Amino acid sequence: MGRMASPLRSKSSAPRVESTRHKETSTVRVETSSHREETSSHRVETSSRQVRTSSRQVETSQRHREGPSLTPSTKRLPQFLEVSSQHVETSSQCTETSSRHVRASSSLRVETTVHRVESPARQSARMAR
């Protein structure tokens, strides 16, 4: 019976190595998902910058129109431009809040997934030792 016990032990140790390999692949998947979330947050930042540049363009157009303020028609135009600049400012604030929301959600998701993957990996390391 002593000869039959030795091959059973070798078979039981084999699945443990396979389980550790599967956990390693899962950690790589978590890293790729975190990088994707980072790229999406960068895209939101670029869109907010574009809105800021457009608001600056509106301000420059106001100065050009306000310069020759001799005719009544040019006095009516700056009021319309002021309303448009306010609309651009509110839209830029909305994009800033959305970028902050993306950063908060991405950091929380990555932390929770990493902790879940690390806990079984440490247990397998203790079992191997």
From Swiss-Prot:
Compositionally biased tracts (Basic and acidic residues): 18-46
Biased composition annotated in UniProt, kind: Low complexity: 47-59
Organism: Mus musculus (Mouse)
Protein name stated in the entry: Uncharacterized protein C17orf100 homolog
Lineage: Eukaryota, Metazoa, Chordata, Craniata, Vertebrata
Annotated segments matching region Disordered: 1-129
Biased composition (Polar residues): 70-97
